[in-house]
A protein has these predicted regions:
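Acidic, polar ligand-binding/catalytic clefts
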Residues: 74, 78, 83-147, 222
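Extracytoplasmic small-molecule ligand-binding "clamshell" domains
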Residues: 33-109, 248-249, 268
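Ligand-binding cleft/hinge of the Venus flytrap
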Residues: 60, 73-82, 161-185, 215-217
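Extended ligand-binding regions for polar small-molecule ligands
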Residues: 70-79, 139-160, 235-274
């Protein structure tokens, strides 16, 4: 009988130990399952990635990040009631950075590309993102987008503009028209504007809202040429697993659209208004 009692005591001790270990692993599992949105709310702060060299969406003025996108972000942060740490990063580090967990989400304009929509969770759009071309004012050598054959085209490195420029050149070659003289890539778009003004390149490829503002602010220097793509949009993105954060951001953008705040900000920063859809803007297979 004594042996049975001792055996039972050993068994009970082991059972308690195993239960404690399982409980510990369960608690660790619960903690690791916390979403980014839950973490933001729990800690009362968020870190976001921005390229503040993309006027008028985000740019530096008097040492601070300002712009259309910043005003949208401020509206959302006020609703969350958390502390904001907004990082100003080169575009080339933005998308890899969010996937690596260096910040919570991308609060800068991301164009819709087939290779991106399967890697990142896109919010609803914040603006139109159709890719256009801009030339020097009065450059009679270039009157249509087909006239880019033999010309020097400039855009941003690793941007949607780069991908679309390469795709359009391939189409020109397929039609037997030939390609560009060169495709020059810049770290930030403002560098390409300067290169165009100085005659180093013949055309800048970028999204329409940005180029329209550049033309408006520099009359007699630049002209819009033509669209390079069909109508598209620009959004913010999160990591693919952060769909609750993506959905929250989308809900606030839609709220701003419906209460007139987006149009108010568009009037302020662009001087014209854009209609923002809440469905049908992403290609098949998007997250």
């Amino acid at each position: 009988m004594g042996k049975i009692c001792k055996s039972w005591e050993v068994f009970s001790s082991k059972t308690i130990l195993i239960a404690a270990v399982l409980a510990l692993f369960a608690s660790v599992g619960t903690a690791s399952a916390e979403t980014t949105l839950e973490k933001i709310k729990r800690t009362g702060k968020t870190t976001v990635g921005t390229e503040a060299a993309f006027p008028p969406f985000e740019f530096i003025k008097d040492g601070k990040i300002v712009g259309y996108g910043k005003d949208i972000l401020d509206y959302i942060i006020a609703d969350l009631g958390v502390e904001l740490n907004q990082l100003d990063l080169p575009w080339q580090g933005i998308l890899p950075g969010v996937l690596a967990g260096k910040f919570d989400f991308v609060a800068t304009s991301v164009s819709i590309r087939p290779e991106r929509v399967v890697k990142y969770a896109y919010t609803v759009p914040i603006a139109e993102g159709t890719v256009w071309t801009m030339k020097r004012a009065g450059d009679d050598r270039i009157n249509s987008i087909d006239d880019l054959v033999g010309k020097v085209v400039g855009t941003q490195l690793a941007s949607g503009g780069e991908a679309n420029s390469k795709e359009f050149e391939a189409k020109l070659k397929e039609r037997g028209l030939g390609g560009y003289k060169a495709l020059k890539l810049y770290t930030a778009y403002p560098e390409s504007y300067l290169a165009l003004a100085n005659g180093e390149i013949d055309v800048v490829v970028q999204t329409l809202p940005n180029l329209a503002v550049v033309v408006k602010e520099h009359p007699g220097v630049f002209e819009l040429l033509d669209a390079m793509t069909g109508k598209s949009y620009m959004c913010w993105v999160t990591r693919p697993e952060d769909t609750d954060l993506r959905d929250y951001l989308s809900s606030k953008i839609i709220e701003m659209r419906d209460n007139g705040k987006l149009h108010e900000l568009q009037d302020k920063w662009f001087g014209f208004r854009m209609e923002i859809p809440d469905s049908g803007f992403l290609p098949a297979g998007a997250l």
